[in-house]
């Protein structure tokens, strides 16, 4: 039985390739998914690739990984800095966890509404 790797993407990542391509690149999330699927073949991994703009849905996916995941790679987008719920769910997952970002989060300016 292959191990299942969860790749979880948060808010606005569905707009990759459309939203500020000079900052986030021109590749769509579907292109990223295809690249990940291809890479997983070489490691005998089943890939569970998920994206949502809803915090609770991201938490539910992490809960699924607790039951059958061998690892979690997460780009929680803007929720990275604010979600206690995502942090709590990830802390319950005992396998390896990797937090990724497309841009340098330390170089981002403060958000003003």
Please describe what each predicted stretch is:
Residues 48-56:
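Short beta->alpha junction loops
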Residues 65-72:
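Short acidic/histidine-rich motifs immediately flanking catalytic phosphotransfer sites
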Residues 16-30:
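Glycine- and acidic-residue-enriched helix-capping/strand-helix junction motifs
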């Amino acid at each position: 039985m292959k191990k299942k790797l969860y790749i979880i993407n948060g808010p606005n990542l569905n707009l990759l390739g459309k939203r500020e391509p000079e900052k986030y690149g021109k590749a769509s999330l579907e292109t990223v998914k295809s690249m990940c699927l291809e890479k997983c073949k070489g490691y005998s991994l089943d890939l569970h690739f998920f994206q949502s703009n809803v915090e609770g849905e991201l938490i539910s996916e992490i809960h699924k990984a607790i039951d059958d995941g061998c690892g979690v790679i997460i780009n929680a987008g803007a929720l990275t800095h604010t979600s206690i719920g995502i942090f709590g769910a990830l802390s319950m997952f005992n396998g390896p966890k990797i937090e990724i970002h497309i841009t340098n989060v330390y170089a981002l300016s403060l958000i003003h509404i």
